[in-house]
């Protein structure tokens, strides 16, 4: 079972995303179900180590946002073209 700590994003857009990536974080989103989508920011190194395992893509993950646990599955993962970096992940509620 994977547990990821996340924060709700305060800013959105290209500039805000670039600032996140410069701070070793990256943007993500949680959507699906009856609730509204949540734009979040994740720690790059924590998620990079988790996604190296194949189970990250097949198991239900737990994301802790503001103390509330959300069960999700990784839907789409975007990577940098030539650097070993994640640029964005879409999570769908499980």
UniProtKB/Swiss-Prot annotation:
GO terms for biological process: translation. GO terms for cellular component: cytosolic large ribosomal subunit. InterPro entries: Rbsml_bL25/Gln-tRNA_synth_N, Ribosomal_bL25/Gln-tRNA_synth, Ribosomal_bL25_short, Ribosomal_L25_dom, Ribosomal_uL5_bac-type. Keywords: Ribonucleoprotein, Ribosomal protein, RNA-binding, rRNA-binding. GO terms for molecular function: 5S rRNA binding; structural constituent of ribosome. Part of the 50S ribosomal subunit; part of the 5S rRNA/L5/L18/L25 subcomplex. Contacts the 5S rRNA. Binds to the 5S rRNA independently of L5 and L18. NCBIfam families: PRK05943.1. Belongs to the bacterial ribosomal protein bL25 family. HAMAP family: Ribosomal_bL25. This is one of the proteins that binds to the 5S RNA in the ribosome where it forms part of the central protuberance. This is Large ribosomal subunit protein bL25. The lineage of its organism: Bacteria, Pseudomonadati, Pseudomonadota, Gammaproteobacteria, Enterobacterales.
């Amino acid at each position: 079972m994977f547990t990821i700590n996340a924060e709700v994003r305060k800013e959105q857009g290209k500039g805000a995303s670039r600032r996140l990536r410069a701070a070793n974080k990256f943007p993500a989103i949680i959507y699906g179900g009856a609730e509204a989508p949540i734009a979040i920011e994740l720690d790059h190194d924590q998620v990079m180590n988790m996604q190296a395992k194949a189970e990250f893509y097949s198991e239900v993950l737990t994301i802790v946002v503001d103390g509330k646990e959300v069960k999700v599955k990784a839907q789409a993962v975007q990577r940098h073209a030539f650097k070993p970096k994640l640029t964005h992940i879409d999570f769908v509620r499980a």
